[in-house]
Amino acid sequence: MIEKRQKVEIIMGELINTFDEYVFCMFFATKGIHLMGLELSNDPHKETNQIWVGSDCEKNPKMHARMKTTDCIKKCEKNGTFSNEITKSLLVTMYSLWDEAYRHKIAEAVGTDAKYIECPLMGDLRKIRHIIIHHKSIVPEAGVNFEILEWQLPSGKLEITYEMFLEFNDAVRGSGMGIRSHSPSPEMSELLSKMTKKERKSFEDFYKKPDNKKNNVKWPGLDAVLSRVSQLEKS
């Protein structure tokens, strides 16, 4: 019978292999973008010239998109706009794979609920995803505090370079994941089953904050719940 630790190692191996594939995807995509920019820059062009993306150009040409040639060359630069969009999209996809698939697989392997599985590195990636999805890729003035990543993101437009992408995947392959499980005690599990939907949400939201869980901070609503449950049991 495979031990829990072995099961987790197998799952992590699958995750690492999948993430490595995304590194290759990023490498080939950004390399191609950069080479296309160099090719365009070597061709004679004017400030007003446009470049088109078309299909079946020899027999039945169809034009699908256009942009100024000079703008395209600029956006094709190494760590330029096009490459930045690729790296951001891949990071969002990688987080989704962790959150929707691999975290659940690990939880099943160790016999707990996925919400009790924590990974500091993926917590850092979640912050990046939040900026991309909910803040239009704009880093707030206060910046971002990471637990594992050593990135110093300036406020303003979020830019994820090729080198940063590699650093992230190196952390995945190294000791950066630091996966841990924080299942509630049997007593707390019993109490959770007696909470109202509103109480449970308040409890779970409170302990979603890493410092509260790590420092074993008491949930402010605990005494009120204990009192309510006690009164119900006496009645």
Q: How should each PLM-predicted stretch be described?
A:
Residues 1-85, 116-120, 127, 143-235:
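Extended intrinsically disordered or low-complexity regions, especially N/C-terminal cytosolic tails and loops
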Residues 83-103, 122, 126, 130-133:
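Short, hydrophobic, well-ordered secondary-structure elements
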Residues 51-57, 89, 93, 134-138:
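Amphipathic, heptad-repeat alpha-helices with coiled-coil/zipper character that mediate oligomerization
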Residues 107-115:
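Inter-helical turn/loop segments and adjacent helix faces that build the functional surface
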Residues 102-107, 130-141, 177:
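Charged/polar positions within long, soluble alpha-helices
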